[in-house]
Amino acid sequence: EGVGGTSLKGYVTTCYDTLVSLFGKPTYTDADPYAKVNCEWVLNVKYFEEEGMEDYDYDRELVTIYNWKDGHVPLNECQWHVGGKSYIADDLVNLIVGGNIKADYNANS
């Protein structure tokens, strides 16, 4: 699934190394200083809405985490853009980063 139909839903403040440790290597990088996006993760996040739901009772959300018009891949702590098709994307990313929750499996690593 591509990132078509996603748009900015919020922000997460963290550093590049934290994102790599949680989500693996970026899906996309571009060293061009004139590129709008130099670094992006494209993730299909599986989540459960309520406690006690069965393992097969879950939803997925397409999430993107990216820098915007920085001219380089930011390594220090900064405000990363969070994209998605709904505002759940922002909630999920901030929950994962804030709780330092590592995925059992990461297709990007």
Q: Which residues does each PLM region occupy?
A:
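Active-site or metal-binding loop neighborhoods of secreted/extracellular toxin and effector enzymes
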Residues: 94-109
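Amphipathic alpha-helical segments
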Residues: 8-31
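Short, structured protein-protein interaction patches enriched in aromatics and acidic/basic residues
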Residues: 34-48, 58-61
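Intrinsically disordered, low-complexity Ser/Thr- and acidic-rich flexible linkers and loops
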Residues: 52-56
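Short beta-strand-to-loop capping motifs
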Residues: 12, 45, 82-84
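Intrinsically disordered, low-complexity regulatory segments enriched in Ser/Thr/Pro
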Residues: 60-91
